Amino acid sequence: MNGGGKNVLNKNSVGSVSEVGPDSTQEETPRDVRLLHLLLASQSIHQYEDQVPLQLMDFAHRYTQGVLKDALVYNDYAGSGNSAGSGLGVEDIRLAIAARTQYQFKPTAPKELMLQLAAERNKKALPQVMGTWGVRLPPEKYCLTAKEWDLEDPKSM
């Protein structure tokens, strides 16, 4: 660590830890990757595999591309009466983001609610297991052994 800068350590796929920081060549590392390294370091994440920034960049690219495609569809639909040269607006992008969050990112239920539902479900006891030997069959009304089933047509014999 020369020059008083802060180094960021990241773990590559072999398990060794490599160093990315002010000492590494800034020209070789793309700007977006450097920003992601700084973002991870600001969140106190100093050890991660080398492909993590690439995966984050891939996710951001795909998400942005999907939002912009949706915004173009909304703009085309809303701009049917407008001139054909109207560009993409901020409202179209906001609508696309809002529509995408409705189905793409499902929020999980709060832990307290899940514990309450589990306690309510667990109030009802499970049926007792009989201490008999052999194969345990379901109740007689659900078994095919309850009646004599003729699967063959007697006329064909």
Curated annotation (Swiss-Prot):
GO molecular function: chromatin binding; identical protein binding; molecular adaptor activity; protein heterodimerization activity; transcription coactivator activity
Pfam families membership: TFIID-31kDa
Domain Histone-fold residue range list: 30-97
Gene3D superfamilies named in the record: Histone, subunit A
Any Gene Ontology CC annotation: SAGA complex
SUPFAM superfamilies: Histone-fold (SSF47113)
Compartments in which it is found: Nucleus
Region (Disordered), start-end ranges: 1-29
Disulfide bonds: none
Matches recorded under InterPro entries: Histone-fold, TFIID-31, TFIID_subunit_9
Any GO BP: transcription by RNA polymerase II
Alphabetized UniProt keyword annotations: Nucleus, Transcription, Transcription regulation
Domain of life: Eukaryota
PANTHER family tied to this protein: TAF9 RNA POLYMERASE II, TATA BOX-BINDING PROTEIN (TBP)-ASSOCIATED FACTOR, TATA-BOX BINDING PROTEIN ASSOCIATED FACTOR 9
Task of the protein: Functions as a component of both the DNA-binding general transcription initiation factor complex TFIID and the transcription coactivator SAGA complex. Binding of TFIID to a promoter (with or without TATA element) is the initial step in pre-initiation complex (PIC) formation.
Subunit details: Component of the 1.8 MDa SAGA (Spt-Ada-Gcn5 acetyltransferase) complex, which is composed of 19 subunits TRA1, SPT7, TAF5, NGG1/ADA3, SGF73, SPT20/ADA5, SPT8, TAF12, TAF6, HFI1/ADA1, UBP8, GCN5, ADA2, SPT3, SGF29, TAF10, TAF9, SGF11 and SUS1.
Misc. comment: Present with 7000 molecules/cell in log phase SD medium.
Similarity remark: Belongs to the TAF9 family.
Protein name (database record): SAGA complex/transcription factor TFIID complex subunit TAF9
Chain's gene name: TAF9
